[in-house]
Curated annotation (Swiss-Prot):
Residues 288-324 form the DFDF domain. It is found in: Cytoplasm; Cytoplasm, P-body; Cytoplasm, Stress granule. The keyword Amino-acid biosynthesis does not apply. A motif (TFG box) lies at residues 382-402. It comes from Xenopus laevis. This is Protein LSM14 homolog A-A. The RGG repeats are required for interaction with ddx6/Xp54 and accumulation in ribonucleoprotein complexes. Residues 233-262, 323-341 have a biased composition (Basic and acidic residues). SUPFAM superfamilies: Sm-like ribonucleoproteins. Residues 146-165, 171-190, 197-292, 323-354, 404-456 are annotated as: Disordered. It comes from the Eukaryota. The lineage of its organism: Eukaryota, Metazoa, Chordata, Craniata, Vertebrata. GO terms for molecular function: DEAD/H-box RNA helicase binding; mRNA binding; RNA binding. Phosphorylated.
Length: 471
């Protein structure tokens, strides 16, 4: 097949590698996916061709079949595309369609659905002036024509509402589809001014579909609801009301802030003015405006402020807090316990008496002797803790260890640590003693040491006071 001959719309006889012959109208050739699409396809079977699986012919006519190019054995052209009979350019013609008897002209293409990128074939759709699938204007709902992709102007019978420019646009679309291009036909149709005029002259029932062709329908300017206008104007109005507040109102608020009876009405009067939109859609803040930094009429009097504090009393309370009471119980002072008098820092008389009581106590910290104190030392005896006591403390602190009868023993090698071995409890070697001796009942002999039969882990032994480590 030479590239110059227009085969789109031709009747094609195709033989697959399975020796099955098909006849149909060549619809498109996809060079990217290496596929050939035929429309109105009929299968004639194997027709006595040598094959392992003979297939009889079928009478059904398939709407379309897409063939893989690598599985096509032979492809021949039976009939060239037939030219179409064009209508005269009559201004009175708005829409036209041919009868079903001339089914060989294959005039229209209605949708892009079945083939994905490729338009699906359909015959003589009698749709409205504006196509419902993608809003293109033409005879029926056609966008391209199977017939006569030749140099002559026999592509589509043009209607007077569209004019000769639509014929050129249709020929452009046919060329794009025959070359396998994926550009949308709407882009080229929207560039034609005659199509826009045809859309404008369409009938009223077709008005909903004209919005997708050419110029878009203008957006209706709906009146803005009054509630939205009020919402938009309310921040500006509130700002104006706040700026209209006179200075005497603020001064009156400052003068009456100590009077609860006068303060509440003023605040309640200011809050509705502030409303809920105090800070750009926020929930509002307190109704008083910020008038800048605070102004002082005179300098701060440090002497009068210091006169309110008794330094000696503060120092005495501070020293009383630092002192530690003696362990010996003492009699209550003035009917109060000494602990209460130490904690109570507001009673200066009680603190003074506490100072006298604690003065003769034991000194727990002397910086001249050592940096550390002797408060946290619970036992002054210098002794070494025994193994039994250490284990008892560990059990009281951390609880009993979990017993595990699995795996190898935790103590291997020479010495063995706590691995009580053999008859005499000698611990330690990798050659386990033949005996299953040890402390406690003989149970769970898991071979804790390699090669040993009586080995047990340390956690398997129950604690007994008479247990002693073998030397």
């Amino acid at each position: 097949m030479s590239g110059g001959t227009p085969y789109i719309g031709s009747k094609i006889s195709l033989i697959s590698k399975a020796e099955i012959r098909y006849e149909g109208i060549l619809y498109t050739i996809d060079t990217e996916n290496s596929t050939v699409a035929l429309a109105k396809v009929r299968s004639f079977g194997t027709e006595d061709r040598p094959t392992d699986r003979p297939i009889p012919p079928r009478d059904e006519i398939f709407e379309y079949i897409i063939f893989r190019g690598s599985d096509i054995k032979d492809l021949t052209v039976c009939e060239p595309p037939k030219p179409q009979c064009s209508l005269p350019q009559d201004p009175a013609i708005v829409q036209s369609s041919l009868g079903s008897s001339s089914a060989s002209s294959f005039q229209s293409v209605s949708s892009y659905g079945p083939f994905g990128r490729m338009p699906a074939y359909s015959q003589f759709n009698t749709g409205p002036l504006v196509g419902p699938q993608f809003g293109a204007v033409g005879v029926g709902s056609s966008l391209t024509s199977f017939g006569a992709e030749t140099t002559s102007s026999t592509s589509l019978p043009p209607s007077s509402a569209v004019g000769t420019s639509f014929t050129q646009e249709a020929r452009t679309l046919k060329t794009q589809s025959s070359q396998g291009q994926s550009s949308s036909p709407l882009d080229s149709l929207r560039k034609s001014p005659n199509i826009e005029q045809a859309v404008q002259t369409a009938a009223a029932p077709h008005a909903p579909s004209t919005a997708t062709v050419g110029r878009r329908s203008p957006v209706l300017s709906r009146p803005v609801p009054s509630s939205i206008q009020k919402t938009a104007e309310s921040p500006e109005q509130r700002k104006g009301e706040l700026h209209k507040m006179q200075r005497p109102d603020i001064d009156q608020l400052k003068n009456d802030k100590n009077d609860p009876s006068k303060r509440q009405p003023v605040l309640s009067a200011l809050q509705p003015r502030r409303g809920r939109g105090g800070n750009r859609g926020g929930r509002g803040r307190f109704g008083v405006r910020r008038d800048g930094p605070m102004k002082f009429e005179k300098d701060f009097d440090f002497e009068s402020a210091n006169a309110q504090f008794n330094k000696e009393e503060i120092d005495r309370e501070f020293h009383n807090k630092l002192k530690i009471k003696d362990d010996k119980p003492e009699k209550p002072v003035n009917g109060e316990d000494k602990t209460d008098s130490v904690v109570d820092t507001q009673n200066s008389e009680g603190n003074a008496e506490e100072e006298e009581v604690l003065a003769g106590g034991v000194c727990y910290y002397d910086k001249t002797k050592s940096f550390f104190d002797n408060i946290s030392c619970d036992d002054n005896r210098d002794r070494r803790q025994t193994w039994a006591e250490e284990r008892r403390i560990n059990v009281e602190t951390f609880g009993l260890p979990l017993r595990s009868n699995r795996g190898r023993g935790g103590f291997r090698g020479r010495g063995g640590g706590m691995g009580f071995r053999g008859g005499r409890g000698r611990g330690g070697e990798r050659r386990g003693a033949p005996g299953g001796g040890g402390f406690g009942p003989a149970r769970g002999f898991r071979g804790g040491f390699r090669g040993g039969r009586g080995g047990r882990e340390f956690a398997d032994y129950e604690y007994r006071k008479d247990n002693k480590v073998a030397a």
